Amino acid sequence: QGEASACWRLTVRVLEAWRLHRVDLLSEADPYVILQLPTSPGMKFRTKTVSNSSHPVWNETFSFLIQSRVKNVLELGIYDEDLITKDDICFKVFYDISEVLPGKLLQKTFFLGPQGQEELDVEFLVEETPGPPEYLITNNVLVARELSRLDVHLDRAGSTPGGADWGKLELELVLKGSFEDTQTSALGTASAFRFHYLAAQDTELHGRLKSSRSSGWNTDSSAGHFTVPLQSLAGGREVTICVPATDDPGVRLQLKADSCPKELDVRLGFDLCVEEQAFLSRRKQVVAMALKQALQLDRDLQEEEVPVVGIMAEGGGARAMTSLCGHLLALQKLGLLDCVTYLSGISGATWAMAHLYGDPEWSQKDLQGPISHIRKHMAKSKLRAFSPQSLASYWHKLQLRASQGHPTTAVDLWALLLEFSLHGQVADQTLSGQRDALERGQNPLPLYLSLNVKEDTVDTLHFKEWVEFTPYEVGFLKYGAFVPPELFGSEFFMGRLMRRLPESPICFLEAIWSNIFSLNLMDTWYNLAWSGEEWKQHVKEEIHSTEEPEDCLRTSLWTEASWLQPGTALARAFKGVLTGRPLCHHGANFLHGLQLHQGYSGQKDFSTWADCQSDSTPSQLTPQQPQLCLVDAGYLINNSYPSMFRPGRRLDLILYFGYSLSSHFEALQQAELYCRTQGLHFPHVEISAEDRCQPRECYLFADPTCPEAPVLLYFPLVNVSFKDHSTPGVWRSPEELWAGQVDLNKTTTPYFLLNMTYSEEDFDHLLQLNDYNLQNSQDTILQALRMALKHRAPEARPQGAQ
């Protein structure tokens, strides 16, 4: 959605502060104020320092060019200058500029501390600016603004290379707030530079010639400083400037600014992409035929009558991979695999999915083939993965990856180890290559899920964002922003592709989806110490806290509450130890530079997935970060419910495969709580005390009073009748009873999370157990399919549903 919107001039006058407490023991504070507006990139101002004062008076004025359609939150930080150690930050204030009415001077007093003793007085004025409006593209949560491109050409005509000692001179250009920020080049090499920056950016290009020697930089020998205001380049004018140099005054720069294309390379929208919608139409033809045969229907189903069935597989390392193979094999034997439209998973379940989709016809072939491949590599010793030859191969591949521009981390090494362990070699298959498996609707659409978290400041419970991967696109559910998988990992700015990198082989994505090495100490503490009830209470409180700021934003009360008084350096260091992730994934952020819409927090599409306090502070959200930090989605809830409940998919039946060894209903009930708290329709899950002690093989959950809620079939990992039956209805002979003894005891099982090597016998037992449990529930599955058929019927759907 495109729109035109004018820019405004924000003037901020920092007046004075009152009753500032001392930070140093021997003297009063030496305060100064730093002002920053993230939506005006590159603009950062600082007042003068007032020495030894608890009542500093600054009376200084600063100016920002702002766009009224985005969320402009000014950050004012009060610092205490220290000549010996790092300056201490005393207070930080976040102020929503939308409270300032255009043309009316507003004086604001900020109460800084929790007791409100310290105060800061500031004046604000917003005025209209001349000039054409800015063209914006928005989905009402994110906003892409106009970009300009600055080309700089170094002209050395008339200069004498020998006389200027060219080998020791470098040209450094700095454009704060641009994608490139700083570029440096020796005068004897490249002579062209390019910067991408906000068209409505009120900043300057800074440059200098400086001397570079083999021993390092010599800042004292810097020469040729110059500044070019970007406004002087408006209208596509070409400007030539002379750059004074130490020995050669003849160096000139030719500068020209042009508009960047308005089209985006990031898709902004919450609807399903057109490729997925086309797939659904193709897949419904396959599903309709399979349902007609399975349910013995006497007529063909029309497209709008075909129910949408999805599989939701829990994580659990090799246990999840093996178990999912057993479940899919059983569905194939029952002739029900073609009834499934979506196949979603996290963590270890994605290993099975990624392997299967390497064959475009996998669900139309006997699954015993790919399962035998997995069995072979699961049973082999993994010591070869650590042989000198293998390690040398990993090193070569990581070097190649780095040379392509990808940042390499320990997660990439995990990817290579994982691929070698599971398949004996590193294949070149990609996520986008899985489209071949969807072109005729011959397989379900795979949905892979991950979490984006903070790298070193917050634990997973207090900041997490769902990131979905499909063969068609990768994106954030909360922001409604997606890119094709070919471009995931490439560098973006303001929705435009800046630098394209080769698509990563899927093993590197598998390592992200199952990245169990990014737990910080706080995550570990919550996992060990929190009970289920404490987790539920936290979810309710955290989500409730995201609902409060929207009301508060309409008044000045929110601004007074949005102060931050950071702790001491020791406290910050201790927090860093607790929340740091030493082995996390680093990747380019395709949301980088995009800004939040003025009314983003009130949008239903955003609030559906908003579940942490940071959601009310734009500068804390992902568009402001240069990199992503993706981890295993099982860190929060061990299932892929966000993919199943994404608006637009409207599932009628979910087959939920649980792979936990002990807490069989925990992730299921966590998903129910989360969905209900977020306003998503989830069938009511009620588990009796008897079932908690001795779970059954299959549960059916439905809510007839809520037509929006899908029917849900839950299959926990249990060994009930399989102990006595080789196949449904066939009792084991005394000689066969050993084959039904599958050890699922948490303390003695061979299927513990970190075990990557199963004996062939253990692999077969786990595979056959899941195969049997699902086949033994055939009648319940058929009942659920009939309910789904009824659920999809036009008279059963709420108005407006599809």
What are the functions of these language-model segments?
Residues L328-S390, Y641-R646, R650-E690:
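Catalytic or ion-translocation cores adjacent to nucleophile or general acid/base/metal-coordination motifs
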